[in-house]
């Protein structure tokens, strides 16, 4: 299923211009609070800049960034229904929106916005947890979400500086500090986050 005028499929990529971006922004904005939308625009600004610096596809960076939190404000019962209905690992039910809005949210983006580009969808899936294997676009969205201009927390300035010179080091920095925060707050840690840590922090030494 797709929403009438969003059944554009791959033209999001092949014909992505200012008009297409505006249409996509409108669809995204309708799904979230103004505060969340400002964050999304900050992630897009950062992702496109990183894509330009590291030689990634800037259109894909824009689309992935604009849609990465598309499902963030959906109710938990909608996620639970999709997890049960669509064959996701039921262990996901032990977690919450912080995990679901990426891993499950990518399927919502695909269904409702007719975005079928697997590279974009994968970047949405792993933008919170990371992964042991990450494409250039995966890393860009993962880091951009962490360092966008609206973020304000101890260490974000250093993270931004690292991202300008070494994207892999920025992935490692983010992963390490996110894991430390989760441990300090005694939050449940999703296994893929540990896989990300082992690959990008431990194995990069």
Model-derived segments and their meaning:
Residues 26-30, 48, 53-175:
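Divalent metal-dependent catalytic cores for phosphoryl transfer on phosphate-bearing substrates
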Residues 33, 52, 129, 180-187:
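Generic secondary-structure signature for well-ordered alpha-helical cores
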Residues 34-38:
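A short, charge-rich alpha-helical start-of-domain segment used by transcription regulators
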